């Protein structure tokens, strides 16, 4: 546990020196597992010898400073030179105003659907009547210019810095 606390201090100091504020560093709960050594007598398994516990702890950086986090993610192996066993993952990207974006996208998609329906009605010699039903599809976030496929349950890409958001709206109108 003392080693874990020492490493935590070194990691915190490192991240702060790289431009991350202390309140952006979130240490998760300490996880523990037993460390055993398999024992053999004359080539036959004779049980385990308990060696102690292995403690691990993960951390997360919650920051809006994307460039700083990306730079740190490329340089984080510097901690290995300080004797820290460290496993890192690539940054994940979240749009912080997603709720507002959804409302705006629903509004635009609805207006676009109506304009298309009016065009279809005009081109077929009819007129667009009253709206009889409206259905909203799944909100999708995919990597920009990626070949990610849309999903019935929705897609939520967090690995791409540049993302594309889409939604499908189905409007049913009476035809006159």
Regions found by a protein language model. Name each.
Residues 1-176:
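Short, charge-dense linear interaction motifs
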């Amino acid at each position: 546990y003392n080693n874990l606390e020492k490493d935590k201090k070194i990691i915190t100091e490192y991240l702060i020196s790289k431009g991350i504020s202390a309140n952006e560093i979130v240490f998760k709960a300490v996880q523990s597992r037993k460390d055993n050594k398999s024992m053999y007598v004359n080539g036959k398994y004779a049980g385990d010898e308990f060696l102690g516990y292995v403690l691990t702890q993960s951390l997360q950086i919650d920051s809006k400073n994307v460039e700083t986090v990306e730079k740190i993610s490329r340089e984080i192996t510097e901690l290995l030179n300080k004797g820290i066993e460290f496993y890192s993952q690539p940054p994940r990207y979240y749009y912080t105003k997603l709720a507002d974006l959804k409302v705006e996208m629903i509004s635009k998609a609805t207006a676009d659907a109506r304009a298309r329906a009016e065009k279809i009605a005009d081109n077929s010699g009819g007129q667009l009547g009253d709206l009889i039903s409206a259905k909203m599809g799944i909100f999708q976030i995919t990597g920009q210019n990626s070949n990610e496929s849309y999903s019935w349950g929705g897609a939520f890409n967090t690995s791409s810095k540049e993302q594309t958001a889409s939604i499908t709206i189905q409007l049913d109108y009476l035809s006159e």
